[in-house]
Amino acid sequence: ILNYDQVVKVTGSFKAPMGCRSFLGAYEEDGEQIHDGRNNLGVVSLNLPRIAIEAKGDEKRFYEILDQRLALAKKALMTRIARLEHTKARVAPILYMEGACGVRLKADDNVAQIFKNGRASISLGYIGIHETINALYHQGHIYDDEMLREKGRAIVEHLSNAVKQWRAETGYAFSLYSTPSENLCDRFCRLDTKQFGVIDGVTDKGYYTNSYHLDVEKKVNPYDKLDFEMVYPPLANGGFICYGEYPNIQHNLKALEDVWNYSYDRVPYYGTNTPIDECYECGFTGEFECTSKGFTCPKCGNHDSEKVSVTRRVCGYLGSPDARPFNAGKQEEVKRRVKHM
């Protein structure tokens, strides 16, 4: 659900996300807010847990390395922009000449002009606040320690300040994006395990936690999870979502409505994950068992992808892992998820 007042407060105007969580900022032409025809130019994501591992518990060193990686990320993003400088409208007529991007350029017009001054966003992403805190401080769970919560928030604020500076320097609408990490959760962790070995609380699970989200194994109620995550969207207003995991609550819709009402004044964008799986062999409807090898009907054991329907929200959007399986890291993360009600 999109909570109107919070979307306006956090992003500057009301709009729906692009994809699962990418939000544009406010942009006006001739005094009128424009949303249609705008776009994001791409994302470069930072592996925060790796930086924390390399810092070896030294917070000052962590921020020194982080600033080095930020400079590299900016260079990569500016390279994306540079590739557009001499691109002509004729390379994609539907986008640039027929109105899909809100303009009707001539064939030999440069397209770069329509991405400037905040019309298009370009984003810095990040992954693994949970593992970063574990690697850097070794002081318990971030949820249970107010000091660690503040450390996590401060890291994201540092990233947010960086993109604000880039925007002031370049005129392009740099934004901070809480990377969905459907693939990066597996890839970054796998690369770090290969280089640094298995580290408790960091690389030992086979995946990194999605952006700023609470550890999927932490058993809390949906209200407390909202309170934990609500500090991040205002900092990462180029991309965000908060969500809760629920059992089948068709007979207790008032409870779900109560959570939605609670979310309204706290977060801009909230997802409700409830089981809607179905077995075409025995007729079972509910929640399939998630294993390292896939999803299985709890009633008859059926796991034939052609005879089941499985739906999961992963990284902000709904997918069908029976038809398009997750990578090993994301499958493990989904398997470890606990219910918040």
Q: Where is each model-derived feature located?
A:
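Contiguous, well-ordered alpha-helical segments that form the cores/surfaces of helical PPI scaffolds
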Residues: 122-135, 157, 313
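Short loop/turn segments at secondary-structure transitions that flank enzyme active sites
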Residues: 49-54, 130, 135, 182, ...
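Generic structural signal for hydrophobic core residues of well-folded globular domains
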Residues: 132-137, 248, 263, 314-318
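Glycine-centered flexibility sites
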Residues: 125-128, 238, 316, 329
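Conserved catalytic cores of very large enzyme subunits
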Residues: 1-118, 139, 145-299, 303, ...
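Long insertion/accessory domains within large nucleic-acid-processing enzymes
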Residues: 301-341
